[in-house]
From Swiss-Prot:
UniProt-listed InterPro entries: DNA-dir_RNA_pol_bsu_external_1 (IPR019462), DNA-dir_RNA_pol_su2 (IPR015712), DNA-dir_RNAP_su2_dom (IPR007120), DNA-dir_RNAP_su2_hyb_sf (IPR037033), RNA_pol_bsu_bac (IPR010243), RNA_pol_bsu_CS (IPR007121), RNA_pol_bsu_protrusion (IPR007644), RNA_pol_Rpb2_2 (IPR007642)
Keyword Zinc-finger: no
Family the entry assigns: Belongs to the RNA polymerase beta chain family.
Gene Ontology cellular component terms for the protein in this record: DNA-directed RNA polymerase complex
Keywords: DNA-directed RNA polymerase, Nucleotidyltransferase, Transcription, Transferase
Enzymatic class: transferase
Function: DNA-dependent RNA polymerase catalyzes the transcription of DNA into RNA using the four ribonucleoside triphosphates as substrates.
SUPFAM superfamilies membership: beta and beta-prime subunits of DNA dependent RNA-polymerase
BP-aspect Gene Ontology terms: DNA-templated transcription
Organism name: Shewanella sediminis (strain HAW-EB3)
Signal peptide start and end residues: none
EC code: 2.7.7.6
Gene: rpoB
Protein name, per record: DNA-directed RNA polymerase subunit beta
């Protein structure tokens, strides 16, 4: 493998044995691709805005004299960029403008004669736009739209598993689910009649819908039944024989062949052997006794030719009397329905008997009554209702997917078709459910991923947009029918509000539009790759059963079987597997390598769950020879959802990677294959809660996916193009681009501005730091700057800590964690949290609130940190209770004398009395002010601080743009110099020419002269562009802010809090091994090894065996080896050993291991590169052991030996307090530990007095309300059990809701009198009132 300059800085030693056939696809593509499809112009009109507009337009007036047609649309540019939107608290959106054409037809002339056409571009609201990282900024906060897994449209056959009826009989049902429109259900009842439901309303006989489709009884019988024909003879009947139909029947007469010999005696069961004999004798007719027909069902109406009387009606049972009547009427042949209890039930025949309707109109009326109970049905209304239900494109749409699923399920060859149902479709579904009831077909598995599809952002936004358009359509149609259209333009007809409202509602408050989890880069990526079965049109927690939540065989390579929440959402919220993607229909696909005759090729095919069932697929861990041929005779593989063994020749596909089945979070866990799945689930979930530490530390034991994840998450800055680093400081990186990657006429400079100390959604700190130096060569994709939780471009969620597995004085009882004071001293787990505190000045009835430093009754010291505008300085250290923004609010007016009123009226003083309503630092918070922002309403005078901030921002913007312009200008002049040198100018000549004159020189060579003129033009464009950009930026900064009604001013203060680690904080490893810190121990008391190196963290060994997460032990051993090798490299550097020796040792490290795919050619590195690599390896050699393909025990031992450590992974330890050696050797090594966002500071809370609930007068609950602790029934039982009567009385009265008692108590405590007088608890009064409200009076006797 060829490494770039920046990749050579630190190379992760990879133990992967399998070749990487396919790189992990871009992790955010599910979000970005979906939204791109929504916003991109689509000429076919199948998706996005285009599809929505075409489905609603043209809108015709009721009279048909005018219509509004859609021409085209375009999305404008967002007014503010993403960062500005976040600061201002507005939505990052672009205006949608649609070109509409209004056509007026001439009433007097021939139909279709156009009288007038008007075209106009109409504004149709703002559409939130997706940022480059797949998020939306809505009202200043970053949100993610989670993809939804819902039941695919189409037809599904299922049964109730015998749960509906007490007998346990299995009742089958079929359901046609459209993309939008009414659901159509068919179901059997316990008596085997077929019923239909529309939109889950009351059921009707299924034949009613057929009658409504204009089928007669005769048509229905012809559709669903075969016939048995009889010829009527004098004393017997002759039946047309289809031998196969006799199978399973008991012969009620002797069956003879054509020669008269008996084949089946009367009373015997007819078997397959008898049928073969009948077929051999070519018997086509069979004589049967007359009573054989009794009870059979007539296949048609039989009418007396003379009188016209119906002798036997269709679907009626034929009796012997009926037969006599038929023969009297001269009818010689009769046909009955072929019905067989085994595989041809009389279901439709039974249904027709239940059906009371006889013709189409009656059926339509019956359907109308069911859909609109209480409304009188008319013929037209009933017709229209039924037509609109399933046969109108406006009301019903199966969608492309639905039609494909429908046709495939019913074995119709063509995947294409209309979005509405046809008569044939409904009949085909009914025939299929009868086939299933007859036992000739299987029901569907609704949890199969071929029957569930993904609905992503773009599709959901399109649906919501269409909802808004439909609302507008109604209004437009009414307006087209009213008034004089000659005066109106399209703009006058369209009101954009309903569209904006629908879109805003979806992005702002839909269940699937979620506040982005921004703890760390992993949590961001995972949130964007989340697949939820909940939400509108999906399941609900309460109704979802075990089957839906369970792992299904089709999840393989599509949804992760590990990563899902614990709790009520388990299995309903899933994560996309690493390589999965959605196909054009929205079904999940996963990649496989093609196998031909036992040889694996490099051809990769993506298969959906439906397609996968047809193939035999081997796992990725199959042994292959050098040519890719499978070596084993029998190979473990999957076929139709089952695991089995097959020969190499039968294999058709093979997995692309062992990590294919798991999500990115699970594939970050090293030695995952050694962990129990439950613990792996916790490990995957807890990594998302890791707080970014002050200084990120790459994991020594990783899995090789860390870099991919960090780059794809967008928190690091990756180079867009190659070149070299021209300039670096803390907030900007400038890259001079390679000539080969430039587009003609471009300056050739890429500028990357870094994000500094901004607040994330979870109040953690987002900060980017450059990790390149000036002059460094850069390749496209190289990491230039690290973000939160990344280290040299690798994801780094925690810290590598020195671990020992041993008990220590009970401080690691029940998973507690004992840590060394050194960890806290070195700030290993110190995190920065940024809080945003807002102060809002409103216009009240009594006058305006004012932000000022002039606050009544506040001492000088409390105002010491405020400036003259009453706003805190940046850099001030503040603690709980300090004033951040001084604000005064007018008080309610006291009763004024007439004289005072007169003075008020003259001098216009609104309110002389004001009260202090300043913004203060919350209790228990201590930190530093890092930023202040002031937003002032348009038309309100800006205070001094706001003007200062504005000037600072304008200055900063000018500085940034000037520097950018200078760099670009320098690039232009540089190219001009090179051009002039090539054209014959000397260096001395150029030195005398002023820089501004370089671009106006004259050259003899015409081509070069043209090029120089182009550069001059480019320079002028750059200058004009700079002026324009600066003016736009300045206008944006200085314009007034669009604040909510009644708000005059908002001041936002950003407070950075530094949190060191302390007892009560929650920590975890990556294997689900979590615990709370019990004690921070002095370094001198910690156990230490023979070299005197103390342990950082002591974990309980009892936490390993029962949890079955052995991966953590292997990680500790591998970590020890990785750190040991780093220590040896450090020693070599300190001893200044020969470079060849160092190079040899590093080479030995990277070449260790059997069949390892990674090849690092250390010999090709320059001496400087080797030294830089060695310096970066001093802290330990980072290793990668990919899931299911990681390091073997033997390789770990070899690594330990190479580090000069005991291969057992255990060492002697000594007690830090006594110096004595511990009894036995202890497992010591390095484990990657995370500090989770469950900090004791956020949870610790105590209350003396505070707010009370209005009705019960009990204290509120929770830290946010400054509430109390609930003293529940079990706690009451405990006090009762101990007989602590007075404590119990105190808890239930004065400490809770005895209003008078607690007031007295407070007085008594102040007076030093420690007694209490408990009274009546308020909740008892509430109970009395509740009972009285039921009409029962209770009065209490006073003693």
């Amino acid at each position: 493998m060829v490494y770039s300059y920046s990749e050579k800085k630190r190379i992760r030693k990879d133990f992967g044995k399998r070749p990487q056939v396919l790189d992990i696809p871009y992790l955010l593509s599910i979000q970005l691709d979906s939204f791109k499809k929504f916003t991109d112009q689509d000429p076919t009109g199948e998706r996005g805005f285009e599809a929505a507009f075409r489905s609603v337009f043209p809108i015709k007036s009721f009279s048909g004299n005018s219509e509004l047609q859609y021409v085209s649309y375009k999305l404008g540019e967002p007014v503010f960029d993403v960062k500005e939107c976040q600061i201002r608290g507005v939505t990052y959106s672009a205006p949608l403008r649609v070109k509409l054409r209004m056509v007026l037809y001439d009433r007097e002339a021939a139909p279709g004669t156009v009288k007038d056409i008007k075209e106009q571009e109409v504004y149709m609201g703002d559409i939130p736009m997706m940022t480059d990282n797949g998020t939306f900024v809505i009202n200043g906060t970053e949100r993610v739209i989670v993809s939804q897994l819902h039941r695919s449209p189409g037809v599904f056959f299922d049964h109730d598993r015998g749960k509906t009826h007490s007998s346990g009989k299995v009742l089958y049902n079929a359901r046609i689910i459209p993309y939008r429109g009414s659901w159509l259900d068919f179901e059997f009842d316990p008596k085997d009649a077929l019923f239909v439901r529309i939109d889950r309303r009351r059921k009707l006989a299924a034949s009613i819908i057929l009658r409504a489709l204009d089928y007669s009884t005769q048509d229905i019988l012809d559709l669903f039944f075969d016939r048995v024909n009889f010829k009527i003879k004098k004393d017997s009947l002759v039946m047309d024989l289809v031998a196969e139909r006799l199978r399973g029947e008991t012969a009620s007469y002797d069956i003879k062949d054509s020669e008269g010999s008996i084949l089946v005696e009367k009373g015997r069961r007819i078997t397959a052997r008898h049928i073969r004999q009948l077929e051999k004798t070519n018997t086509t007719e069979l004589e049967v006794p007359v009573d054989y027909i009794s009870g059979k069902i007539s296949g048609q109406d039989y009418i007396d030719p003379d009188t016209g009387e119906v002798l036997v009606s269709a679907n009626a049972e034929i009796s012997l009397e009926d037969l006599a009547k038929l023969s009297l009427a001269g009818i010689k042949e009769i046909s009955t329905l072929y019905i067989n209890e085994l595989d041809n039930g009389a279901y439709m025949s039974d249904t027709l008997r239940i059906d009371s309707t006889t013709n189409r109109l009656e059926a339509l009326v019956e359907i109308y009554r069911m859909m609109r109970p209480g409304e009188p049905p008319t013929k037209d209304a009933a017709e229209a209702l039924f037509q609109n239900l399933f046969f109108s494109e406006e009301r019903y749409d199966l969608s492309k997917v639905g039609r494909m699923k429908f046709n495939r399920r019913l074995s119709i060859d063509d995947d294409e078709g209309t979005g509405i149902l046809s008569k044939e479709d409904i009949v085909a579904v009914m025939k299929n459910i009868i086939t299933i009831r007859n036992g000739n077909d299987e029901v569907d598995d609704i949890d199969h991923l071929g029957n569930r599809r993904i609905r992503s952002v773009g599709e959901m936004a399109e649906n919501q947009f269409r909802v808004g358009l439909v609302r507008v359509e109604r209004a437009v149609r009414e307006r087209l029918s009213l008034g004089d259209l000659n005066e109106l333009m399209p703009q006058d007809l369209i009101n954009a509000k309903p569209i904006s409202a629908a879109v805003k509602e979806f992005f702002g408050s839909s269940q699937l539009s979620q506040f982005m989890d921004q703890n760390n880069p992993l949590s961001e990526v995972t949130h964007k790759r989340r697949i939820s079965a909940l939400g509108p049109g999906g399941l609900t927690r309460e109704r979802a059963g075990f089957e839906v939540r369970d792992v299904h065989p089709t999840h393989y390579g599509r949804l992760c079987p590990i990563e899902t929440p614990e709790g009520p959402n388990i299995g309903l919220i899933n994560s996309l597997a690493s390589f999965a993607r959605t196909n054009s229909y929205g079904f999940l696909e996963t990649p496989y390598r093609k196998v031909i005759d036992g040889v694996v090729t490099d051809q990769v095919d993506y298969l959906s769950a439906i397609e996968e069932g047809r193939y035999v697929i081997a796992q990725a861990i199959v042994d292959l020879d050098a040519d890719g041929r499978m070596m084993d005779e029998l190979i473990a593989c999957r076929h139709k959802g089952d695991s089995t063994f097959m020969g190499a020749g039968d294999i058709q596909y093979m997995d692309v990677s062992p990590q294919q089945i798991i999500s990115v979070a699970a594939s970050l866990i090293p030695f995952l294959e050694h962990d129990d799945a439950n613990r792996a689930l916790m490990g995957a979930n807890m990594q998302r809660q890791a707080v970014p530490t002050l200084k990120a530390d790459k994991p020594l034991v990783g899995t090789g996916i860390e870099r991919t994840l960090a780059v794809d998450s967008g928190v690091v800055v990756a180079a867009k193009r190659g070149g070299y680093v021209d300039y670096v400081d803390a907030s900007r990186i400038v890259v001079k681009v390679n000539e080969s990657e430039l587009t003609p006429g471009e300056a050739g400079i890429d500028i990357y501005n870094l994000t500094k100390y901004t607040r994330s959604n979870q109040n953690t700190c987002i900060n980017q730091r450059p990790c390149c130096s000036m002059g460094d060569p850069v390749v496209r994709g190289d990491v230039l700057a690290d973000g939160p939780s990344t280290d040299l471009g690798d994801l780094a969620l925690g810290q590598n800590m020195r671990i020992a597995f041993m008990p220590w004085n009970g401080y690691n009882f029940e998973d507690s964690i004992l840590i060394s004071e050194r960890v806290a001293m070195e700030d290993r787990f110190t995190t920065i949290h940024i809080q945003e505190l807002s102060c809002i000045a409103r216009d009240t009835k009594l006058g305006s609130e004012e932000i000022t430093a002039d606050i009544p009754n506040v001492g000088e010291s409390a105002l010491s940190k405020l400036d003259e505008s009453g706003i805190v300085y940046i850099g001030a250290e503040v603690k709980g209770g300090d004033i951040l923004v001084g604000k005064v609010t007018p008080k309610g007016e006291t009763q004024l004398t007439p004289e005072e009123k007169l003075l008020r009226a003259i001098f216009g003083e609104k309110a002389s009395d004001v009260k202090d309503s300043s913004l203060r630092v919350p209790n228990s918070v201590k930190g530093t002010i890092i930023d202040v922002q002031v937003f002032t309403r348009d038309g309100v005078e800006k205070d001094k601080r706001a003007v200062e901030i504005e000037e600072m921002h304008v200055g900063q913007a000018k500085k940034d743009l000037s520097e950018e312009f200078q760099i670009l200008e320098e690039g232009v002049y540089g190219r001009a110099r090179n051009l002039l040198l090539n054209a014959g100018f000397t260096e001395d000549q150029l030195a005398t020419i002023p820089r501004s004159q370089l671009l106006v020189q004259t050259i003899d060579d015409e081509a070069k002269q043209t090029e120089l003129e182009q550069l001059a033009e480019q320079h002028d464009e750059l200058k004009a562009d700079f002026d324009k950009k600066f003016e736009i930026k300045r206008r944006k900064i200085t314009q007034g802010d669009d604040l909510a009604p009644g708000v005059l001013k908002i001041v936002k203060v950003y407070l950075a809090v530094k949190r060191t680690i302390q007892p009560g904080d929650k920590m975890a490893g990556r294997h689900g091994n979590k615990g709370v810190i019990s004690k921070i121990n002095p370094v001198e008391d910690m156990p230490y090894d023979e070299n005197g190196n103390p342990i950082d963290i002591v974990l309980n060994p009892l936490g390993v065996p029962s949890r079955m997460n052995i991966g953590q032990v292997l990680e500790v051993h591998m970590g020890a080896a990785a750190k040991g090798i780093g220590d040896r490299i450090t020693a070599m550097l300190e001893e200044q050993r020969e470079l060849a020796e160092l190079r040899g040792y590093i080479k030995e490290v990277y070449e260790l291991g059997e069949e390892v795919q990674q090849r690092v050619d250390i010999d090709s590195f320059t001496d400087d590169e080797v030294l830089r690599l060695a310096k970066n390896l001093k802290g330990g050699v980072p290793t990668a052991t990919p899931a299911f393909d990681g390091a073997k025990e033997k390789e770990i031992k070899e690594m330990l030996a190479l580090a000069g450590l005991p291969t057992s992974g255990q060492r002697r330890l000594f007690d830090g307090r006594t110096g004595d050696e511990f009894e036995r050797q202890v497992t010591v090594g390095y484990m990657y530990m995370l500090k989770l966002n469950h900090l004791v500071d956020d949870k610790m809370h105590a209350r003396s007095t505070g707010s009370y609930s209005l009705v019960t007068q009990q204290p509120l609950g929770g830290k946010a309300q400054f509430g109390g602790q609930r003293f529940g029934e079990m706690e009451v039982w405990a006090l009762e059990a101990y007989g602590a009567a007075y404590t119990l009385q105190e808890m239930l009265t004065v400490k809770s809701d005895d209003v008078n008692g607690r007031t007295h108590m407070y007085k008594n405590i102040v007076d030093g009198n420690h007694q209490m007088q408990p009274g009546m608890p308020e909740s008892f009064n509430v109970l009395l009132k509740e009972i009285r409200s039921l009409g029962i009076n209770i009065e209490l006797d006073q003693d």
